[in-house]
Amino acid sequence: MKICIVTIATGRYIQFVEKLLDKITEHFLVDHDIHCLLFTDNDMDEVSENIKVSQIEHKPWPEPALKKYNYINTEREYLKDFDYVYLFDADVDIVDTVGEEVMEDLVGVLHPWKVLEDKSVYPYEGREKSTAYVSDSDRDRYYAAAFTGGKSKNFLKMAEIISARVSEDEENGIIAVWHDESHLNKYFNEYPPVDLPPSYMFPEELMGN
C-alpha cells in the first residue's frame, strides 16, 4: 500500500523531523511504500523523492496547531493518490512496531491522561458558539491529537470538515479550547474511529513508572 505520513514542524519543531522519519522507517508499516508530507515555515528544499515539503507562513502559537487540517486541506490533490494517510505530531517518538492494525477507515488514540477520568471532566469544547462544541450528554471517549489517520478518502473528509469549522470559528472570533484536539474530538464524536489504546501515545513523563 502507498502510505503518506503528514507532519507539521514550525520553528524549532523542525529539529524533531529527522528522528520521526527515521523511527517511521524502522517501526511504522514497514512493508509498505512510505512517503512524507512536511508542512514547515522553515526555509528548506525537498530532501528526498519520498518527502514533499509544503511551505506555510510563519504564525504565532496556537495557529500552527489550530490550523493543522487547514494546511492538510491545501494538499488534497497530492494526498488523494495515497491509500492511507497518517498525521503525526513532529515530536512523537515511535518505540515499537506499529503494524496493519492501524489500517482502518480512521483510527484514534484514546488520550492517556484522560482515559481513567470520568467523562464529565473530559476537556471537550463547552461553548455552544464554537463549531467544536460537544454537549454534556454527548460526551463519550476523548482522543489525543498527536496521532490519527486512516484511509485517504476518510482522512481527507475529516480534514475538509475540520478545516471548515476552524475557519468558521475564526470568522466568529473563536478559538477552540484545545485547538485542533477539540475539533478532532468533535469529529470523532460524530464519526467514531476505530479506537487504539493509550499505549499508542504513552506520555514520556510516565516512562519508567
Task: List each language-model region with its residue ranges.
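Catalytic core and acceptor-binding pocket of nucleotide-sugar-dependent glycosyltransferases
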Residues: 137-209
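N-terminal anchoring/stem segment of glycosyltransferases
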Residues: 1-67, 74-81, 153
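Short, polar loop motifs at secondary-structure junctions
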Residues: 36-45, 90-97, 199-201
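Conserved glycosyltransferase catalytic-site signature
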Residues: 65, 69, 90-92, 177-182
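GT-A fold catalytic core of metal-dependent nucleotide-sugar glycosyltransferases
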Residues: 71-118
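Active-site regions of enzymes building and remodeling cell-envelope glycoconjugates
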Residues: 47-59, 102-110, 209
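PAPS-dependent sulfotransferase catalytic domain
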Residues: 101-157, 161, 181
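Short His-Asn-centered micro-motif
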Residues: 6-9, 38-41, 88-90, 110-111, ...
